[in-house]
């Protein structure tokens, strides 16, 4: 597989600019709820479409904007969602952290909150030619559910 560094750089810059826009809108009180950006982690989201297939599934965390863009390429849906618009990715009710896309993207604002769901999904499709990707941060490593999920999928 050849991965174009130019495309990854462009994707990283796009994600960074979107995140900066969210921070600006948040500071002006134009967003409902909170916003957790992935600034400093943009490369991961930009690289994602190069390392997974269309049918693969992504479970993300509270800093999942870059993952969302990388998996779905739905920049407009993300922007509208975080701004609370009914035209957003999940009708304006999910906000920054609770995102979904029928292309196979799920996120949750609770640290390691998707670990058991991702493990169950992976178990359910274990005979298919798909990959389940799960993103977590180090802050979730103290949560018991993560280790239970890892035990389930290690069998």
PLM regions with names:
Residues 20-23, 30-155:
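Cofactor-binding active-site loop characterized by glycine-rich and histidine/acidic residues
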